[in-house]
Amino acid sequence: MSSLFRKKPLETLSAQSKSKSLARTLSAFDLTLLGIGCVIGTGIFVITGTVAATGAGPALIISFILAGLACALAAFCYAEFSSSIPISGSVYSYSYVTLGELLAFLIGWDLMLEYVIALSAVATGWSSYFQSLLAGFNLHIPAALTGAPGSMAGAVFNLPAAVIILLITAIVSRGVKESTRFNNVIVLMKIAIILLFIIVGIGYVKPDNWSPFMPFGMKGVILSAATVFFAYLGFDAVSNASEEVKNPQKNMPVGIISALAVCTVLYIAVSLVLTGMMPYAKLNVGDPVSFALKFVGQDAVAGIISVGAIIGITTVMLALLYAQVRLTFAMSRDGLLPGLFAKVHPSFKTPFRNTWLTGIVAAGIAGFINLGTLAHLVNMGTLAAFTVISIAVIVLRKKHPEIKASFRVPFVPVVPIISAGICLWFMYSLPGVTWLSFVIWIAVGTLVYFLYSRKHSLLNK
């Protein structure tokens, strides 16, 4: 039984972090944009209006502040680990050195499902926006190629979703420098489009629309904070980049915390302007930002925002694929997954085969499977990871006080305990079918560990 809780030696992690198999090219600026790219998708254009109309009213800005603070607690934990143990694998690698092999494998197994389902689900959303854009030009894809079987009448394969994943795969496989350049350009365009809405919309703000400010009471604000919490998920993907970052001890914490801070400011600003442009009760529509712009006669800007939604989703897919590949790379290097996933291309300095295998699987899922309620597993997986890393910080401080970190979580163990408690509360609020799917996936992972990973682990040698 003791082998189930064997821990990876810090010396091994230190040696791996100094390995030159992956190229160190990322700066704090690159990391910040990677995090923003993964967090801000279509949610900022959709969830702001919907939650304002049904849960919080103009006080939605307070909901976003509360949710941002809750996410910050977990972000602090990621920042401390990434500055003290700058290695690929994120919470998998961090829990391996603090909580033991079995739990590390299971949280890695959990994140594998989270990333691939999120990637496929986001690609499906991209497909819908892309088809709507084509329809505006009176162009239409054959019905059989517009969705997965069961998603709509006559659909057999979601071609746009599969194609966009394969295009993103081609970019990511060519090298971190190339994919970073692409991500930076697209994220800056996305931020520019959001700022365009804020600048144009602020001219139409009527303070009377902010009254009553809290129509659903404080209870509505808190419940809405639980809803918008999920709009922040994705910043953890940054921690998978540690081995490709210049001066990771300094730049990793800056990238993680800066990404979360920028996203929080943008969410608050959009919420403030949106609820000021028109009565909050009218915002319960599928595209509230575009709807509000049309409401004030800014149809052209509304069209630009629709294009911005497509751009926004693209960077989310890139960040998710990047995180998935770096996670399986780390697990394979430790012997817990087959060696194929850890092979690095001699020219591109990327896990080339791993990237394409992941991309093809995700494209197949997006093309053929109607994800439905499985999309909730993304939230479950992320919250489980947040809980584990919060606990792991406490263990790290107690078991390895000698580790020097450029960023340290304040008020340990109080902050990590609060972080874990909030995440467990959010997990409890998820549907029963999500819990059932999660338990089944973890059970499958346990079998894989005992049948393969335990025997092939490098710690056996």
Swiss-Prot record:
Residue spans crossing the bilayer: 33-53, 56-76, 102-122, 152-172, 185-205, 213-233, 254-274, 301-321, 355-375, 376-396, 409-429, 432-452
Pfam families attached to this UniProt entry: AA_permease_2
Protein's cellular compartments: Cell membrane
Consequence of gene disruption: Disruption of the gene leads to almost full resistance to trifluoromethylthioribose (3FMTR), a toxic analog of MTR.
InterPro entries: AA/rel_permease1
Keywords (A to Z) from UniProt: Cell membrane, Membrane, Sugar transport, Transmembrane, Transmembrane helix, Transport
Transmembrane helix in keyword set: yes
UniProt-recorded Gene Ontology molecular function terms: amino acid transmembrane transporter activity
GO biological process assignments: amino acid transport
Topology of the protein relative to the lipid bilayer: Multi-pass membrane protein
Gene Ontology CC: one annotated term: plasma membrane
Function summary: Involved in import of methylthioribose (MTR) into the cell.
Annotated PANTHER family: CATIONIC AMINO ACID TRANSPORTER 4, INNER MEMBRANE TRANSPORTER YGJI-RELATED
Record-stated family: Belongs to the amino acid-polyamine-organocation (APC) superfamily.
Protein name as catalogued: Methylthioribose transporter
Organism whose genome encodes this protein: Bacillus subtilis (strain 168)
Source species taxonomy: Bacteria, Bacillati, Bacillota, Bacilli, Bacillales
